[in-house]
Amino acid sequence: AGEECDCGSPANPCCDAATCKLRPGAQCADGLCCDQCRFIKKGTVCRPARGDWNDDTCTGQSADCPRNPFH
């Protein structure tokens, strides 16, 4: 418990493999809305639209790509 990131790989520059905590200055370690340890800006498409659905976009506050509520 208390893990902030997946510490399986010491190669991840955002995550301290010894503590499973984000490195200083890192906002995230992985996820569709995480790029180089930082949250991708709000409104960036993280999952393109399919059919009549709208694009899923990053919130700017999380590494996760939220599902569009209008699916």
Swiss-Prot record:
Motif Cell attachment site, chain ranges: 50-52
Main location: secreted
SMART domains in the record: DISIN
Subunit relationships: Monomer.
Additional facts recorded: The disintegrin belongs to the medium disintegrin subfamily.
PANTHER family found in the cross-reference section: ADAM A DISINTEGRIN AND METALLOPROTEASE DOMAIN, DISINTEGRIN AND METALLOPROTEINASE DOMAIN-CONTAINING PROTEIN 28
Protein name per UniProt: Disintegrin simusmin
Record lineage: Eukaryota, Metazoa, Chordata, Craniata, Vertebrata
